[in-house]
């Protein structure tokens, strides 16, 4: 007796433990989201000492405002814009660094700068469970920034100042998590892990000497300085 067998291979779906297309979407089509983050810090040092730095007398502040808006053109997918404004100031009256028998000092130094950034955003969500309260997301950012700043040092024999302009063009990927605190208000946490950017800097020293530098970088790296926490309101 001759037995003929036929075998066929069939691709099988692998379940990774989360549902990417739930019966009802985590983020419905047509939803608008608006939100962002802001931060303000100020410091005043009066004869303060920190390790080898003594006699610090300074004032300064940092301001950061990062609004964004996203429109969800498909279920669990959205596009939008992210704007950023950052400003910082440091007025150092005096400070000394003492290491062994070596002492160096600085006085009458001033620095101020501000930066504008604008990025287009594409966002995709991966829901966690069926409760529709928590999800992972990934933001793909394309845009750039422009920065202006000046430093002034009157502590030497002659006063010296430097004016700086800088720009950045970049493509970045920022994954994160979102958790709804109410039906429409959500807390978001994201961090940069991948980026490709081109940056350049122009300097004018004492309104006479010119300087220039540029750089290009690309790679995977967790950027702890890019960790962002903010609130967003969703118009469902």
For the regions a protein language model found, what residue spans apply to each?
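Hydrophobic h-region of N-terminal signal peptides that target proteins for export
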Residues: 2-10
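Short glycine/proline- and aromatic-enriched beta-strand/turn motifs that initiate or cap beta-hairpins
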Residues: 11-71, 223-236
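Extracellular loop and loop/strand-boundary signature of outer-membrane beta-barrel proteins
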Residues: 50-55, 102-111, 156-163, 213-219
């Amino acid at each position: 007796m001759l037995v003929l067998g036929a075998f066929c291979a069939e691709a099988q779906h692998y379940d990774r433990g989360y549902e990417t297309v739930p019966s009802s979407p985590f983020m419905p089509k047509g939803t608008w989201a608006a939100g962002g983050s802001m931060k303000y810090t100020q410091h005043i040092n009066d004869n303060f000492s920190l390790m080898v730095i003594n006699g610090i007398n300074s004032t300064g502040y940092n301001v950061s405002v990062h609004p964004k808006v996203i429109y969800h053109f498909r279920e669990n997918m959205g596009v939008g814009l992210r704007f950023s404004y950052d400003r910082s100031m440091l007025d150092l009256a005096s400070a000394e660094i003492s290491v062994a028998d070596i002492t160096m000092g600085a006085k009458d130094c001033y620095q101020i700068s501000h930066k504008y950034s604008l990025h287009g955003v594409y966002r995709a969500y991966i829901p966690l469970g069926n409760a529709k309260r928590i999800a992972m997301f990934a933001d793909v950012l394309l845009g750039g920034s422009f920065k202006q700043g000046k430093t002034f040092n009157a502590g030497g024999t002659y006063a010296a100042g430097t004016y700086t302009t800088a720009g950045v063009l970049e493509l970045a990927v920022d994954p994160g998590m979102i958790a709804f605190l109410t039906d429409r208000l959500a807390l978001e946490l994201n961090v940069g892990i991948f980026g490709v950017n081109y940056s350049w800097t122009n300097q004018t020293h004492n309104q006479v000497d010119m300087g220039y530098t540029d750089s290009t970088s690309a790679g995977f790296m967790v950027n702890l300085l890019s960790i962002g926490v903010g609130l967003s309101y969703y118009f469902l």
